[in-house]
Amino acid sequence: MTADSPLPSVYSLFDLHSHSQASDGLLSPEALVLRAVEQRVTVLAITDHDSTDGVQPAREAIARHQLPLQLIAGVEISSLWENHEIHIVGLGVDIAHPALTAFLAEQAERRLARARLMAERLEKALIPGALEGALALAAGGAVGRGHFARFLIAQGKAANMQQVFKNYLARGKTGYAPPQWCTIKQAVDVIQQSGGRAVLAHPARYGLSAKWLKRLLAHFAEQGGEAMEVAQCQQAPNERSQLAQYARDYGLAASQGSDFHQPCPWIELGKKLWLPGGVEAVWQRFPDILQ
């Protein structure tokens, strides 16, 4: 957002979690911002997995098309806590900050090492060519399980993403390799060093019991985490209100985001994104993410 861009109004629609081809999204950064405007999103954060490569092309596309869209530079960092992969979104980061660029280069090496191990395990299961296939689908972006999933579907090994993860890529399955990510503290620190705000992504998606989710939230807050996602497109009944209560309990600001990866009927940019009463929105507590 430029210095003379207007601040969002009360009627703004924020989507603070989305992915482009810079990681495992299907749309280019240009197509992503165009779709966001079509869906009446007015403030969009591009938060690719361990990559900020989609941000500058998106900025250029917004300027070229003169889109009525404010872009927040973001990233979604993969971390490890108690043997669970936990994602930390950074909002309002300086994508050129040396600490962030060096950190993301390390994450890219970890990603590639994991991809090689996944491919080795799939090859032992008589599924050759997985690494080459996944890297081709990543097209220079951050390679991840989503690319392996698309490769396996194209090979006829599964009908859809849910099935391919269940049969091949979930923990304990043939193509799963344990991640060697950074700690939550390291993720929070580098986000803040680069001028951003640290947000716990999709807290209800980690398969944690209520007791363990509270432990995660307490740990995240203790490590300097500042906000948590409360609203998403797809949520179980009462999940949003429960997450809002957790945000209040742990002193965290509330964020919202679709976690959009590709066009599909149930997850769409800006869809069903609203915050319950009694929480403080991350853009209200930390207006610097809009600058």
Each PLM stretch: what is its role?
Residues 2, 61-218, 278-280:
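Extended substrate/RNA-proximal surfaces in nucleic-acid metabolism proteins
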Residues 20, 97, 144, 236, ...:
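Alpha-helix initiation/capping motif
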Residues 1-84, 168-170, 183-189, 194-265, ...:
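An N-terminally biased module of ancient metal coordination in phosphate/nucleic-acid-related enzymes
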Residues 258-291:
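Catalytic core of soluble alpha/beta enzymes
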